[in-house]
Amino acid sequence: NTLDSKCLQYGVEIHDRMQAEALIHDGERCMGAIVRSLRDGELVAYIAKATLIATGGYGRIYRATTNAIICDGGGQICALNTGVVPLGNMEAIQFHPTGSVPTDILMTEGCRGDGGTLLDVNEYRFMPDYEPEKAELASRDVVSRRMTEHMRKGFGVKSPYGDHLWLDIRHLGEHHITTKLREIYDICTHFLGVNPIHQLIPVRPTQHYSMGGVRTDKDGHAYGLKGLFAAGEAACWDLHGFNRLGGNSLAETVVSGRYIGSKMVEYLKGSESVFKTEPVNDARKLVAKTIDDIISCRNGKENCFDLRNAMQDIMMDDVGIFRNAKDLQNGVDRLLELSERAKHIGLHGSVKGFTPELS
């Protein structure tokens, strides 16, 4: 991809199939990370004067999300586990109105921007009833709430994957769909088995973006540890507030990458190159023990994938688009129950390299 090509162009060494497990620190300064090879499970200490967390968001804690499978909050967890680095605005989650069903692949806002409409189980266009002025062109959070509200009233389309609504772009015509919305046409035909020229597209509000993350100052420096930075969706840089505008994350990526990168260079020029060995050894031993303890649980009755799915359902049910004290407390109680059950996980394998059970 483009990023890999640029790295190769500038001679940046890429270590692929490596997963960060913990940050190395002494309570005041970050010295790198303990990383697990997904090939053979070897733990490697990456020593660094400056460390950047750029692992993306945490959308995979929800059942329905447009995020890639690796966006499970791993970077935020590494920061939180230090005990000194705070996270910020973790409750700030954006839902996109039109995630496809059942794949949750994003149906771009260009569909509605070009004139696409949202229909219910009766193929009735309902958005003008809720938002007379903007209808489908209201902001993402508004459209997502209205769609959810309409489905809760019983107007959703029943399916094995849960209720959904319809996105209709048929009236835009074949030429427009296959040229201006070519990506949507390809996604629908290849992944949904739907021809959007003649058929309706099943959609529902889907978790899309995380405004929260590792709390940083304006220069991307994480609070709590010197030498630790965060950027992009992994960070709480406070650029978006609690509701990102469409397209702004791309702008943030470009701007923060250049700006925070330059601030890291400034930090490197003024930082010492002497590292203590004790924090490195302690971090590696702790990660090794954690992995060994998990793998040794071969006789536990709980399945880690069942627990993950249950967590995702809780987040969708109680910490979704609509939030209130009752549902939030119910969600907390149910998550605490899962936490107790997680103490009795039983793994099927003992591989320390690539295994979804450890990831």
What spans do the regions from the language model cover?
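A conserved beta-strand/loop element that lines the FAD pocket in flavoprotein oxidoreductases
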Residues: 8-20
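Glycine-rich loop(s) and the adjacent beta-strand/alpha-helix scaffold that form part
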Residues: 50-105, 137, 152, 159, ...
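Core beta-strand elements of the Rossmann-like FAD/NAD(P) dinucleotide-binding domain
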Residues: 40-50, 223-225
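An anion/pyrophosphate-binding glycine-rich loop and adjacent beta-alpha core
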Residues: 78, 85-195, 199, 263-270, ...
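A short, glycine/Asx- and small/polar-enriched loop/turn
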Residues: 25-31
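General beta-strand structural signal in soluble alpha/beta enzymes
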Residues: 14-17, 45-47, 53-54, 87-92, ...
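Glycine- and aromatic-enriched mobile tails/lids
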Residues: 119-128, 132-137, 156, 209-211, ...
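Short beta-strand to alpha-helix junction loop
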Residues: 1-5, 15, 65-73, 100-102, ...
